[in-house]
Amino acid sequence: MVTYINHIDAIIKHADERCKEHGSRLTVKRKQVLTVLVMSNKALSAYELVDVYKQEFGHNMPAMSVYRILEFLENENLAHKLSLVNKYVACTHISYLHTRCIPQFLICRDCSKVEEINIKSTIISELNANINESGFKLLSRQLEIDCVCEACI
C-alpha cells in the first residue's frame, strides 16, 4: 500500500512540475481532483468526481468547480475527456512527456474500466488517409474504442 501511495505522490509531483514549467499552478483542489482520477480504475463523470471528492476529502465541491478543474487538467495534458462516455481519466503519461503520442482509449462498456494505449503513428496515418479518401476529415485523432474488458467477459 505504501508503494502505491508513493507512486501516486510521484505522479502528482510530476504534474505539479509540468504545470510550473507552463507557468500555471496545480492548486490543492486541482491536486485532489487529479489524485481521485489517478486512483480510479475507471473513467469518472464530473458528478461522480463530486461524490468521490466528498468521500475522500470530506468537503463538498460544486460540479461547476469540478468542470473548471477538469478543463484545466485537460489543457495541461494531465487528464483526458472521453467523449464516448462523457467521463474523464487521468493521463497515464503524466510522469513523462508524450508529445508524440496521440491518446487512444479502450473503454469497457460494462464496468467503465479504461486503458490508455499507444497505437503506431503509421496506423493513425493510414486511418486518416482512408477517412480522407471517403470524403471526410478526421476532427480528433483521439480514438475511443467501445470494448469489454477481460474481467467482464
Functional labels for PLM-detected ranges:
Residues 75-153:
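Non-DNA-binding regulatory cores of transcription-related proteins
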Residues 22-24, 38-41, 56-57:
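Short helix-capping/hinge SLiMs at alpha-helix to coil transitions
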